[in-house]
Design a protein with these regions (language model features):
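Hydrophobic transmembrane alpha-helices and their membrane-interface caps
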Residues: 7-78, 85-89, 98-110, 124, ...
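Membrane-interface catalytic loops of GT-C/OST-like multi-pass glycosylation enzymes that act
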Residues: 112-117
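Membrane-proximal cytoplasmic C-terminal regulatory module of class A 7TM GPCRs
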Residues: 143-149
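N-terminal membrane-entry
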Residues: 1-2
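Structured binding elements
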Residues: 118, 123
Length: 149
């Protein structure tokens, strides 16, 4: 985890932006437990693997959204309307990743008894992490940059 933090700070040149991404990663851990609860699955060793995978996926989604926002913000002063357009453009990449992940875990939900907790935790967690990246990252960017109307 320390290497992830160091890598994010070096890549983004910002402790605040790395903190935003890491907060999404921490939220994804809770989303994996929500997936276990919704799927009525027991928490065991297989269920322990899901938060680790979700952390990676949520960091990936967050980096994509934040890089699109930073790219646009470096060109000019960005308004809230322009920020929404940037996030909409980034949505395609994130949705593609999330749908392929869900498609991969769908057979495990229905066919596998052993991997069912992992599949439930990852599937619900991926949906939540995607929504978190698309909504939370822009909101935190607005707060940090103090963007007006």
């Amino acid at each position: 985890m320390i290497l992830i933090v160091i890598g994010l700070v070096l890549a983004l040149n910002s402790f605040r932006q790395a903190g935003i991404i890491l907060s999404v990663a921490i939220l994804s851990i809770g989303l994996s437990f929500l997936g276990l609860f919704i799927g009525q699955q027991n928490y065991g060793f297989i269920g322990t693997i899901a938060p680790t995978g979700l952390i990676g996926l949520s960091i990936n989604d967050s980096i994509i959204v934040l890089s699109h926002i930073k790219e646009e913000a470096e060109k000019k002063l960005i308004s809230k309307a322009e920020l929404i357009e940037v996030v909409i453009r980034a949505t395609r990449h994130i949705i593609t990743t999330s749908l392929t992940t869900l498609g991969g875990f769908a057979p495990l939900i229905f066919a596998s008894v052993f991997f069912r907790p992992l599949a439930w935790a990852m599937s619900i967690g991926v949906l939540g992490a995607t929504m978190t990246a698309l909504l939370y990252i822009p909101a935190m960017f607005i707060i940090l940059k103090k963007i007006k109307h």
